[in-house]
From Swiss-Prot:
Transmembrane segments: none annotated. This is Uncharacterized protein C5orf52. The gene is C5orf52. Residues 38-47 have a biased composition (Basic and acidic residues). Residues 1-13 have a biased composition (Polar residues). It comes from the Eukaryota. Coiled coil: none annotated. Residues 1-57 are annotated as: Disordered. Residues 14-35 have a biased composition (Low complexity).
Amino acid sequence: MTQPTRPSVTCDQGSSTIGGTAAQATTSSSATSGSNYQRDRLGRRPEIGVGGQPQICFPRPRSAQQPVLFSLMNSSEAAMKKTLPKSHLSRVIIHDNRITQRIYEMEVSALEKTKKKISHYYEHLKKKFMTEQLRKLGRWREESVNSNRYLTFGIPPPV
């Protein structure tokens, strides 16, 4: 008692068309002309089973259409995101932006502190200059008063 041989079933990895399975499901002895037609049409060799057994080949199931990536990224970032979907690229970019923002804020605060210091130093130098000028002016007045006493020759100064 021999059991009838069952046809082998495989999954066609490269085929995305369903029309290629009809000629492959028939036996090789009865469909040589159909197989040649199929080979010429699709550019493949016909599948020949071992011992003349029919071989049934199913195409891979089609997946749902790929979702379109929509973002405000430029194309290179979008391509990087598409090729590395499980990467933490967005987190890295956000982290890098935070670090850059922090550095920028530190530079701005340091610049503001420097401006304040320079402003205070400028005010200090201006005040020092003015006091020195007032001191000189006062000393010149005293000297001029003292020298005018000797130069008056008895003429009283105007009142």
